[in-house]
């Protein structure tokens, strides 16, 4: 099996741009994941985010998690299939931030997370334009496709997770296998404790921890908009007996009322090869369905949305 794709973004500026773009396209077509190094986010900022995240978990969340899970380990044989061995909270950035409302964060932590989110947003839009270039779409098409009808903005937020040592890793997953419902996911993960895996060709493959990297993975909405040229893939977090794994997954998703459908240019390009197979829907409707079916295959979700597509038949497509 090929090695996990790592993209050096500095090479996009020189003579190796074409080869680097090809690597990105191959990663999107065959992996649904790739890892960015030498990106635009300062390593000093990433170090601060990591320090503050780990301090916050230790001070405010670790004991709560231990107390919550202690009793559940006893019934693990019954409950493990419906539980994830993770401690999380969620920060919303767009369309309206809730950062000031998150309890127990210091002013320093809020300031650093705000700056980090701004850098991630710019990086997400840069990556989306790289995808547009590879797909032959107009620059900015994916950003426009993600824009909410009302706000003109995407939905953007960060899931802050810690995966503590697990005494029964044979029974618990850190996070059960799933595809991500949204658009583009940017992950800043622990560079010391592994655990993230993706499903490729029927085998679980480790996503290697690398210092100061950002892992990119594609969500279900990218699969729909690209008419299946790029696909979301199943991934999971494996619980570990040693070490606490930090994970900050930032989701650059469509606005809740954004209308999602295959890009007409891609449907036309592939018309001779296959028929359009992906539905047209409002993103919020998909999220409502996903909430109850997250840990199941994505294909039945797409089928349900196809059946509901008549409800949005009168909505106008985005033009290229």
Swiss-Prot record:
Domain named Fe2OG dioxygenase: which ranges? Answer: 154-254
Q: Where does Fe cation bind?
A: 178, 180, 235
Using the UniProt record, name the top-level EC class of this enzyme in a single word: oxidoreductase
Pfam families in UniProt:
2OG-FeII_Oxy (PF03171), DIOX_N (PF14226)
Show the PROSITE patterns listed in the entry.
FE2OG_OXY (PS51471)
Alphabetized UniProt keyword annotations: Ethylene biosynthesis, Fruit ripening, Iron, Metal-binding, Oxidoreductase, Vitamin C
Tell me which cofactor or cofactors this protein depends on.
Fe cation
Pathway per its UniProt entry is: Alkene biosynthesis; ethylene biosynthesis via S-adenosyl-L-methionine; ethylene from S-adenosyl-L-methionine: step 2/2
- Give the E.C. number(s): 1.14.17.4
Family, similarity comment:
Belongs to the iron/ascorbate-dependent oxidoreductase family.
- Protein name according to UniProt: 1-aminocyclopropane-1-carboxylate oxidase
* Organism whose genome encodes this protein: Persea americana
């Amino acid at each position: 099996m090929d090695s996990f794709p790592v993209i050096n973004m500095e090479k996009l500026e020189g003579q190796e741009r074409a080869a680097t773009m090809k690597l990105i396209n191959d990663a999107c077509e065959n992996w649904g994941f790739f890892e960015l190094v030498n990106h635009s986010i300062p390593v000093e900022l990433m170090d601060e985010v990591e320090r503050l995240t780990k301090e916050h978990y230790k001070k405010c969340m670790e004991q709560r998690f231990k107390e919550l899970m202690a009793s559940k380990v006893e019934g693990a044989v019954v409950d493990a299939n419906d539980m994830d061995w993770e401690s999380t909270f969620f920060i919303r950035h767009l369309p309206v931030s809730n950062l000031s409302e998150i309890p127990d964060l210091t002013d320093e932590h809020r300031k650093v997370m705000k700056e980090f989110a701004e850098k991630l947003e710019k990086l997400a839009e840069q990556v989306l334009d790289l995808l547009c270039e590879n797909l032959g779409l107009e620059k900015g098409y994916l950003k426009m496709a993600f824009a909410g009808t009302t706000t003109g903005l995407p939905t953007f937020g960060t899931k802050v997770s810690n995966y503590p040592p697990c005494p029964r890793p044979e029974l618990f997953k850190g996070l059960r296998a799933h595809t991500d419902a949204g658009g583009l996911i940017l992950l800043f993960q622990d560079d010391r404790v592994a655990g993230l895996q993706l499903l490729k060709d029927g085998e679980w493959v480790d996503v290697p921890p690398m210092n100061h990297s950002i892992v990119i993975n594609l969500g279900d909405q990218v699969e729909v908009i690209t008419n299946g040229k790029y696909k979301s893939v199943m991934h999971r977090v494996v619980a570990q007996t040693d070490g606490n794994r930090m994970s900050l997954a930032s989701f650059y998703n469509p606005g809740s009322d954004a209308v999602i459908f295959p890009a007409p240019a891609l449907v036309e390009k592939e018309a001779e090869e296959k028929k359009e197979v992906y539905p047209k829907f409002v993103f919020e409707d998909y999220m409502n369905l996903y909430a109850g079916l997250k840990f199941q295959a994505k294909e039945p979700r797409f089928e349900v949305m196809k059946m509901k597509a008549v409800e949005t038949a009168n909505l106008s497509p985005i033009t290229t």
